[in-house]
C-alpha cells in the first residue's frame, strides 16, 4: 500500500511518543476541499474530517487568508488584556445559541471541565450536598478527570478510578430512570443530544423536555454537550434547535469545528449559570486568542448560508446509504442528524475502515460495529455518490 507510514515517521513516533494512539498506516501531507493527500500523492475522500473538526474541509481560501493576515499581526496576548475578536465572537455565539455569556478555552474536554465547575459552584451555593451530576449511559464527554467522571462508558473509565464522586448514570431516553435519579442533591443534568462516540444515538425531544423540567424543579443546571453534534453539523447551529419545541439548556459546551482546526472550545451559559463563576474562579491561558477567534468569526460568516445545504446533503447521504443497505444484509441501521451519520453493521467495522483506506476513503469505526461519518460541511452530492460507490465495492468484498 503506497500510504503505509514511512519507517522514519513510524519509528520516531514509536521511540518518542506516548503509545496511546493506534494509528492507521497513513502519513498525510496536504488537503484541498474534502480530500487529503498522502506523502505519495494518493488522494482520499475524507468523511471523518479530523473527527468532526475540519468543517470547511482543507485549504479553504477565506480561512487561509484570515490565518495569514492574523498571524502577521497578533497570535497570542493572554486574557490579561482585551483584543478585537473575543467580544464579537461571544456576541455571535450568544445570539446563535439563545444564551447570554461565553467562556473561551481550547477543547471540548476543557469546556466540559469548566461547565462542571460551574455546576459545582451553583450547587454548593444552595447546599454543600448538592453536587450530583446525572449523565447518560453510553455517553462520552472527554478524557480529563471531570469529563471522564461523567462519561458513561466503562472502557474509558476503568483505568483511572476512583474518579470525581457524584456522577449518576441513567439509560438514554429512559424517563422513569431520569426522574428517579433526580432530586435535591442534583447539581446538573448533562447529555449529548446525539451520542457520537456512543454510536450515533439520538436523545428524544420528550426526554430532553423532561430533563429541562427536572432541572427547573430541583434548581439544577441543564448542560448540553454540543461538542460533536453541534456547531452546524445538524443543519442548525446546535442540535437542541432541531427539537420541536426547542429545549434551551442553562449551559452549552462546544468545540471541534469552531475554528476549523485551530483549538477553540466554549462554554455558553445563561445568566443563572454564569452567576456561579466570579472573578478568579476559572481561567485559561490560551483560550480565546486573537487567531482562533478571528478564524471562528470567519467560519460563522461562511456557515450561515451553508446550514440548509448541510441538512440537504445529510438527508441525501442517508438516503443513498439506506439504498445501499437493501443490497447488503449485514447493514443493520443507518442513523444520524445532518452530517453526523452512523451505519451500524452486524460485522466488525475495523476491517471495513482499513479496506476503505486502501480504496481512498477515510471513515471511522466506533462501538466496534458502527461506521461513523463526520464529513466537511462543503460535501456535495457528487462526493456522496463517490463515497457510496466505494462503500458498495467494499461491502461486496466484506459480504463475499
Regions found by a protein language model. Give the residues of each.
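Conserved N-terminal phosphate-binding loop of PLP-dependent enzymes in the Aspartate aminotransferase
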Residues: 2-400
